[in-house]
Amino acid sequence: MPTIKQLIRKKRQPNLNVTKSPALRGCPQRRGTCTRVYTITPKKPNSALRKVARVRLTSGIEITAYIPGIGHNLQEHSSVLVRGGRVKDLPGVRYHIIRGTLDAVGVKDRQQGRSKYGVKIKNK
């Protein structure tokens, strides 16, 4: 607990809100171009080959974004839409690629949770 004298010398600093997705610069999504598409392994105790892409955004910032869903068609120079949202077991991956927009096609044969993977309703 500071004394009154200490508060006069240096006032209390307000807690500034630190953004979890600074590369988006306050926008809900940003467009970018894939510079590299590759796989990385997650932290312990998980084990897999997670698909990620290095993306250069229109703002000029280069980020690492996760490619959700099973299978993808992304390659170098693909145009993608990126949203915020980290992947808990991949350090440094704080963004997700939005499936079903621009060059990222939706997940094939997806029945449930379709809106998250860019899949239109399948008519019988």
Swiss-Prot record:
GO molecular function, one term: structural constituent of ribosome
Protein's name according to its UniProt entry: Small ribosomal subunit protein uS12cz/uS12cy
Domain of life: Eukaryota
Main location group: plastid
Organism: Epifagus virginiana
Source taxonomy: Eukaryota, Viridiplantae, Streptophyta, Embryophyta, Tracheophyta
Signal peptide: none
Gene: rps12-A
InterPro entries with a match to the protein in the record: NA-bd_OB-fold, Ribosomal_uS12, Ribosomal_uS12_bac
Keywords: Plastid, Ribonucleoprotein, Ribosomal protein, RNA-binding, rRNA-binding
Keyword Protease: no
GO biological process: translation
GO cellular component terms given for this protein: plastid; small ribosomal subunit
Function as written in the Swiss-Prot or TrEMBL entry: With S4 and S5 plays an important role in translational accuracy. Located at the interface of the 30S and 50S subunits.
UniProt-annotated location(s): Plastid
